[in-house]
Amino acid sequence: MNMEKRRIDAISNLGLAHIGDGVFELLCRGYLCEHGFKTVLDLHKKTVAMVNAPAQAEFVDKLLPLLNEEELSYYRRGKNAHVHAVPKGATPAQYAKATGLEALFGALY
């Protein structure tokens, strides 16, 4: 086990998701800027459409077959984290998948 792995393992599941939330949003914002969205309103609307639990859950379904075992373990850590509230507009299953995705991005960051 290298130092980086130990550092990641020391972060809580929801801590990884917290980091990954920021990473995922930054990646989405960069993608939108690179693909021709110019106005602040367009950038904001498209970002909000991408960075929410239902959209992230849909993205996870496409991403899962591409993950290796270590990446899947980070995803599962987040997906199985105990959250006490689910945002309106998302089902508990969607929110769990989104939290798993964010934990994965937090670990890979």
Locations of the language-model features?
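Double-stranded RNA-binding/processing signature
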Residues: 1-109
